Amino acid sequence: MTDRPVRARRPSKATTKTAGGRSAPAKRATKAATKKATATKATATKASATKAVTKKARPTKTSATKTSGTKATPTKTSALKGGETDPRSAKLSPTPREVSVGTDAAFASGGGQPRRRLKNISEVRHFFRTNDVPILFFGATPFNLLGLDRWVRNFTYITYYDAWDGAHPRVFTPTNKPYQEFESGEEINNWLLTNAEVRAHIDAATPRGVRPKVAMVFFNSETEDISKELGYDLILPAASLRQHLDSKIVTTQLGNEAGAPSVPNVLTRVDDWAGLQAVAEKAGLGDELVVQTPYGDSGKTTFFISSEADWKKHSADIVGEEIKVMRRINNRPVAVEAVLTRCGTIVGPFMSELIGYKRLTPARGGWCGNEMFPEVLTGESRRTATQLVRRLGDRLAEEGYRGFFEVDVLVDTDTNDVYLGELNPRISGASSITNVTAGAYADVPLFLFHILEYMNVDFDLDVDEINERWEELASADVWSQMVMKETDDIVQRLTATPRTGQYSLDASGGLVFRRPALDWHQLQNEREAFFLRIYGPGDYRWKGADLGVLVTKGRLQVDNGQGKSSLAIRARHLIDSIRAEYAGTPIAEPAPPRTNVGVKSG
């Protein structure tokens, strides 16, 4: 493997504002009827699992900001010219080849599950290291839970795109994927569930009489029906309950009942500017207001209103809706994930967010990454936020919810007050950082408590002790991730892309590809980074399309005071270096995309 530099260079005529390196698509297939599925080289269409999925083709417009309500974000339409055939739509002949299993838990022997009650973390670790039940994560890519196979035996990722070109032993991607367009993340997961290759792969890996466990970010009632018909256990709360809890109005009401207050607000309906003023004055919210509608991406359904002109600009989206009217505060958003179990709510590490950076996303206010470091929350603020999340978890239990959820916490930078922001009742894009912390290695990754809640085993864990330990250990670790989107107004078929794997800075400061890697867990210092490619050669890129995710130790932002941050010099260098590896051929005039592949649910 050569340390090929990944420095920025002059774009070729075939590219628009970006230049590329090289990457070779591979093909992969599986034998459906054999006891062990063998991996083969796969087509070069890759993607990310997260916030929403895309269709393969000529885009139609939107952005993938962090969402908190409706999840069927848009997708692109065909970018092929009339009569042009997608070269990836043809069925490929499988070429079997052996791969070595390189994930930790895979080496553990089976031996059946203990049926006695699990009483401590050591027993939980043993339970998962000897697990005989297939546990499957479905998605466009394995981004959200990548690396979890290190702890869980028989854990597999079923994905539409394969960023490793067949080299990851725990990623299965169907070989035959005729060209089609997906409208949402739910559609791509439902397609995977019903795919013949996928079903054969799962059947071959499932012992007789055992029901596979299935998890995913995006699902709906159709997903539930498919899983029931196939004999799979969907280890997630009901889709109808999740939809109910997605409402910002419901989140506010539940938080108030639980003693987890939001920023001073009033829930109401208004028909005109005078009505909004009257409501705000009565509630003592001041003249600068923030108005939110119940469902949708935060960046698209949050409106800042301080004048009649602002009202006229946004009134069409507000009138007729039940809305949340808040006092506008100077705040710092903080993300945290938690798991609601029968023993109580376990709270993960707190993370800051990367929001709206033009180098990463064309969407103003769009989520584009996270940082975890000791100073995200300290002292009393951390304790207050932890209690806020635990109270909300207890209230969610009364609604029948159990398992994983993410919460946005708002810290008032003027008063240091901590408020409940939004609830995201599902796996989120922050999970990738949560599962790699020092706390995760001291105990188990947070998501394992979610799986445990849905397994056929009894357990009695000291949640208070776990939370105290995680608060101490997680706050001492430093990790960051950036989600990189196409920011130029182009539509191209990619001819070269950076490889998935581990990168590092060479002696001259250039970013070079060091070696293939299955995940980012082996990173040691700030000179190293892991890049997860989403789109590969033969795929398309357009303005707003997710290109990949970069994970590294250390911070990627610098604080400028009063809760404001900017991208660090190191972050900008990493972004420019990775972007320089992309090259493509223009295929159409730029068109606004209708959806995108996101990597954070929300």
Question: Where in this protein do the model-derived segments appear?
Answer:
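A long amphipathic alpha-helix within ATP-dependent nucleotide-binding catalytic cores
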Residues: G366-D414, F449-V478, V483, I569-Y582
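ATP-binding N-terminal substructure of ATP-dependent carboxylate-amine bond-forming enzymes
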Residues: K76, L80-H244, W273-G275, Q562-S601
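Intrinsically disordered, polybasic Lys/Arg-rich low-complexity tracts
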Residues: D3-L92, P96-E98
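Glycine-rich phosphate-binding loop of ATP-grasp-fold ATP-dependent ligases
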Residues: P264-N265, E288-K312, P333-A335, K358-L377
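Peripheral (often C-terminal) accessory segments that flank ATP-dependent C-N-forming ligase machineries
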Residues: L452-G602
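ATP-dependent carboxylate/phosphate-activation module, predominantly the ATP-grasp catalytic core
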Residues: R327-V334, A338-R391, N424-I451
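A conserved helix-loop-beta module that forms one wall/lid of the active-site cleft
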Residues: K228-T301, I587-A588
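Conserved ATP-binding module of the ATP-grasp superfamily
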Residues: P261-V263, G284-V290, F304-A335, R391-E398
